[in-house]
Amino acid sequence: MAKKVVSVIKLALQAGKANPAPPVGPALGQHGVNIMAFCKEYNARTQDKAGLVIPVEISVFEDRSFTFITKTPPASVLITKAAGIEKGSGESAHGKVGSLSRSQLEEIAKTKLPDLNCTSIESAMRIIEGTARNMGVSISD
């Protein structure tokens, strides 16, 4: 018989840098999960993606065991890294803070494709392009 899921916890953590301090400790501690076991496993799985924020979805079972799924980094993080900017524009309609080429946009779309609600690269590129436009990043051909 399958274990019963008691809770699903969603966190966004720096790759390879999870530690028992907040936000990880309190989120997992209230469900009785072994915090250090999670931190070690998460850090081992994400150490090759250092410098990125990696969302994680933790399923906690009634016997206090857990499994987790790592997602792809948020589109905004990938866009800021590719454009070489620190953050998006406060007024995206007026102030452009950077630009991306079509090839960079396609690379980000390929990275995000498993987590997006689409199947083709073209539609994934349109989704990422909309995110970039809202951040004040222009797309050049």
Swiss-Prot record:
Modifications made to the protein after synthesis: One or more lysine residues are methylated.
GO biological process: translation
Pfam family name, one: Ribosomal_L11_N
GO-annotated molecular function: large ribosomal subunit rRNA binding; structural constituent of ribosome
Record-level GO cellular component terms: cytosolic large ribosomal subunit
Keywords, ordered alphabetically: Methylation, Ribonucleoprotein, Ribosomal protein, RNA-binding, rRNA-binding
Entry annotated with the keyword RNA-binding: yes
Keyword field contains Transmembrane: no
UniProt similarity note: Belongs to the universal ribosomal protein uL11 family.
Function: Forms part of the ribosomal stalk which helps the ribosome interact with GTP-bound translation factors.
Complex formation: Part of the ribosomal stalk of the 50S ribosomal subunit. Interacts with L10 and the large rRNA to form the base of the stalk. L10 forms an elongated spine to which L12 dimers bind in a sequential fashion forming a multimeric L10(L12)X complex.
Protein name: Large ribosomal subunit protein uL11
Lineage summary: Bacteria, Bacillati, Cyanobacteriota, Cyanophyceae, Synechococcales
